[in-house]
């Protein structure tokens, strides 16, 4: 299934894409795509519904983040060896974990706000993993059983705040609008191998990132298992799993960063695309 949330910010309704790619309304069946709705049992109930029996959503509504009430938004850094190289950092021996504030979450096509005074706002196309069941101390072999599905994430990052101003990465990762998620939550039964997905990103039509999740340092299963040892993962938690090379700070001979008025387009094979315009934060 390709599940989504649509409507004005803060008033999103749950929906599903039908076979023709049209949005059907699910709000008579579930209040949101969150919590227990993301469990295997909850998704099975949605799967049993014939989309043709659901109300058709008219027009072109805003698409929100594909999961609601996110408890934890967990980032993984330097998870592609070639990205670590372009960043001038060693390939990690254990996952590099940081937090993205949930207030950074926005829809896949919402605008990206360039923070006041920022000259180093950067892009990162990433595979997002949505947890579907409470998960603590799980084995790698069973880790994917706790995944509800997958989505596209743009891990927007302000490099000066992230790297140059001391402290943790978190403060450069969590500005408002720095977490576009979606358009769809694609359930795990439709993604048989999350380590075989092409991902890409363009700025103003120029392709900067081309990668495949097979080159991850730590697989999705390894990340879920690892994170479950240091925290309890809950339904609706989102893990964004790192980016391939091609970010702005790695461009040679001189880095390239986002400015107001640009168009960011990105996508992952089978998971849909995002399209954002950049603007100065007010």
Swiss-Prot record:
InterPro entries: FAH, Fumarylacetoacetase-like_C, Fumarylacetoacetase_C_sf. Keywords: Hydrolase, Magnesium, Metal-binding. One of its GO terms (biological process) is urate catabolic process. It is an enzyme of class 3 (hydrolase). Its EC number is 3.-.-.-. Its cofactor is Mg(2+). Belongs to the FAH family. This is Putative hydrolase Bcen2424_5521. It comes from Burkholderia cenocepacia (strain HI2424). The lineage of its organism: Bacteria, Pseudomonadati, Pseudomonadota, Betaproteobacteria, Burkholderiales.
